Amino acid sequence: MIDQYKHQQLRIGLVSPKQIRAWANKILPNGEIVGEVTKPYTFHYKTNKPEKDGLFCERIFGPIKSGICACGNYRVIGGEKEEPKFCEQCGVESVDSRIRRYQMGYIKLACPVTHVWYLKRLPSYIANLLDKPLKELEGLVYCDFSFARPIAKKPTFLRLRGSFEYEIQSRKYSIPLFFTTQGFDTFRNREISTGATAIREQLADLDLRIIIDRSLVEWKELGEEGSTGNDWEDRKIGRRKDFLVRRMELAKHFLRTNVEPEWMVLSLLPVLPPELRPIIQIDGGKSMSSDINELYRRVIYRNNTLTDLLTTSRSTPGELVMCQEKLVQEAVDTLLDNGIRGQPMRDGHNKVYKSFSDVIEGKEGRFRETLLGKRVDYSGRSVIVVGPSLSLHQCGLPREIAIELFQTFVIRGLIRQHLASNIGLAKSKIREKEPIVWEILQEVMQGHPVLLNRAPTLHRLGIQAFQPILVEGRAICLHPLVCKGFNADFDGDQMAVHVPLSLEAQAEARLLMFSHTNLLSPAIGDPISVPTQDMLMGLYVLTMGNRRGICANRYNPCNPRNHQNERMDHSNYEYRKGKEPYFCSSYDALGAYRQKGIDLYSTLWLRWRLDQRVIASINREVPIEVQYESLGTYHEIYDHYRVVRSVKKGMLCIYIRTTVGHISFYREIEEAIQGFCRSYSYGT
């Protein structure tokens, strides 16, 4: 449907029989109203034309060929001449054949039929509203027993067969004989209701507001009772309270949407447009038909049989009518959801019929395959791997994917720079992977964001924008901090990449969807770009110190058992064999690590600036050891640092005890804070 703001949308729900008739009925120019399908036939076996009033009738659903009626006469569609747009001989309008994609029909059911989705699917909406067990309702719908009409507004379920006690032997055969007489038909029609008719009568008598009020009162009474001391009784009360909550929510939904409960019982069965259930001619004079056509034919056959029985009801036994009503109910159930009641219906080749539910639900259904999961151009898909060198707003795009996604832009760049005279030559250069192609691709990608999406998209952070960077390999590289928004990890997850084409889409991607602008959860406001899994493990490994001889190395930097640094005799900084190295700056320490002079976990002493505070308080902490030198200066050794003081107790310098991993981690944090401050100052 299309609302008042011209937005196309789809609404699924219950409709009234009046609305179904309005969708299907159409008035022909001669005043005749058509729309009801009464015959189970499709095409005539000789003429190969649709049967009149059948499942492919041209009077109901429109012509097969535009402007050509069933007689074969052609009339111009939308011509200015005042020619009749209707064939009086066959009754077919001269309209576009595309009408057969949306023109519906209907089957007028001889008896009401319960919609199996609302009866058998869990939770059962009909059982919830009526507050009846599902098994009893199924027995009533499928005519296993009958329902006595309300007496003093107290409806009861009665199993009429087998409910009599034959105290007198003579009545053992006389009472069952009454159920086969003509007098019982009058009694049955007046006092007994069965099948979907009984369900519809009960649903029509419901007052939804009274249901809400009574359910709320009962829920409060159960809540005030408290625990009974019996676990089984407490669980029973809890289940009853949950049921009352579901019942109130269901009743409120019916009131809010202006839907009547009795609409869950069908009296008119919609017939899909023919183009949605086609019959295709193949070689050899054979044809392939949709399974839904066969299921519709079965419904019409049984419905017509029931109509014939009801027109001759005086001579038809009531048992036969009830049996035929059950067959109609089962045929409609199979059409809507084959196999929901047990064994599915199969064809002659033992193949299960594909019902309406099978057509629309699941991964290969109409919605997910055609509407939601539709394949689009300018998109790709690949496995994600971690990109440790990427910024938060960047993603690594493989060359093979990037050249396909941005191929049209690269072709335009080659032609504009006069490197190719036409599209064919440009494509040949791309196939040959000439160096100029990658240069133009780099220029194109610099100003063009891409969208990354991981299914299922459960919230808005399931799709975010990134600045693409060309990488080698065939996997998409991703910054690990954005994984939580996608609910992704690097164990084989796949992600789709899309290219926004219009300027509006690119602007929206840059302003609203870039990953560095989505740092907080839209649901609760907590930070969502936090280190998890691989990053936490990496930070642990990075900041993990050397555990070998930790006590001796911790308090005595001159411990000769510090064997890991023995090969550093020839370095350009002050160091003596058997001692932990001293560094004047973090650059010197990282340089020694790159030259493999020390490893990631080697403990070292790093000179600290006097204007920078040490985390621990020097004034309050007692030194572990004090070492004096010959010139009067001395070293105060603490837990994680050492202070060099002069003779007058003035502080000359401070050394902190750390590792290369800690230094790298500190520098990363420092650069991130400085970058944020610079960007903030530019923004203000």
From Swiss-Prot:
Positions with a binding annotation for Zn(2+): C69, C71, C87, C90
Xref: Pfam families: RNA_pol_Rpb1_1, RNA_pol_Rpb1_2
Domain of life: Eukaryota
UniProt keywords, alphabetically: Chloroplast, DNA-directed RNA polymerase, Magnesium, Metal-binding, Nucleotidyltransferase, Plastid, Transcription, Transferase, Zinc
InterPro entries tied to this protein: DNA-dir_RpoC_beta_prime, RNA_pol_asu, RNA_pol_N, RNA_pol_Rpb1_1, RNA_pol_Rpb1_3_sf, RNA_pol_Rpb1_clamp_domain, RNApol_RpoC1
Binding residues for Mg(2+): D489, D491, D493
Record-level Gene Ontology MF annotations: DNA binding; DNA-directed RNA polymerase activity; magnesium ion binding; zinc ion binding
Keyword Endoplasmic reticulum set for record: no
Gene3D superfamilies to which the protein is assigned, alphabetical: 1.10.40.90, 2.40.40.20, RNA polymerase II, clamp domain, RNA polymerase Rpb1, domain 3
GO biological process per UniProt: DNA-templated transcription
Subcellular location: Plastid, Chloroplast
Cellular component terms per the entry's GO annotation: chloroplast; DNA-directed RNA polymerase complex; mitochondrion
Catalytic activity: RNA(n) + a ribonucleoside 5'-triphosphate = RNA(n+1) + diphosphate
EC number, UniProt record: 2.7.7.6
Cofactor note: Binds 1 Mg(2+) ion per subunit.
Cofactors demanded by this protein: Mg(2+); Zn(2+)
Protein family per UniProt: Belongs to the RNA polymerase beta' chain family. RpoC1 subfamily.
Function: DNA-dependent RNA polymerase catalyzes the transcription of DNA into RNA using the four ribonucleoside triphosphates as substrates.
Self-association state and partner proteins as the record states: In plastids the minimal PEP RNA polymerase catalytic core is composed of four subunits: alpha, beta, beta', and beta''. When a (nuclear-encoded) sigma factor is associated with the core the holoenzyme is formed, which can initiate transcription.
Annotated protein name in UniProt: DNA-directed RNA polymerase subunit beta'
Originating gene: rpoC1
